[in-house]
Amino acid sequence: MEVRIRKGRVSRVRAWLATRKGVRLGDFGEWIALKYLLFRRWDIIARNWRTRQGELDLIAYDGPDLVFIEVRTRHAPTQFSPEKSVDGKKRDQLERLAYSFMERHELYDLPIRFDLIAIETSARDYCLRHYSGFM
């Protein structure tokens, strides 16, 4: 799924982010992904859930499914797409973190899914691609 946003909309988002100190490109991407999922009426249950092993960007319910969402953001044009930045090592880490989250919160016998939201930004707009069940 691909969504394009026009210049005016991105300008307001970037203006808001500019008022916050130390905002990274990744924070911008996670904020856009969060707004996208809320617009689609997903129930967000955690953001930036951390352990010593790493971090899960977003965790949400999409109907009965517990979904672990990895958000990748890049400036366009770039040599590598955001999708290609999720290698086997990162996939293994996401899986370990997901099971750790489920164990800690006693969430057993739930259908789970791993989604990827890839965002490419430019000076005027951004492109969001949502890959459901990417691993």
Segments (PLM) and residue ranges:
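Short acidic/glycine-enriched loop/turn segments that link adjacent beta-strands
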Residues: R52-G54, R124
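Short, conserved glycine- and acidic-residue-centered signature motifs
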Residues: G26, E30, V86-R91
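Domain-level recognition of nuclease-like catalytic cores that cleave nucleotide substrates
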Residues: R104-M135
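Acidic-basic catalytic patches of nuclease active cores, encompassing PD-(D/E)XK
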Residues: E2-R47
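Conserved catalytic cores of phosphodiester-cleaving nucleases, focusing on short active-site segments
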Residues: L37, L56-F80, G88, L94
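Hydrophobic "anchor" residues on beta-strands that sit immediately upstream
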Residues: D43, L66, P111
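Metal-dependent nuclease catalytic cores in nucleic-acid-processing enzymes
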Residues: E95-E106
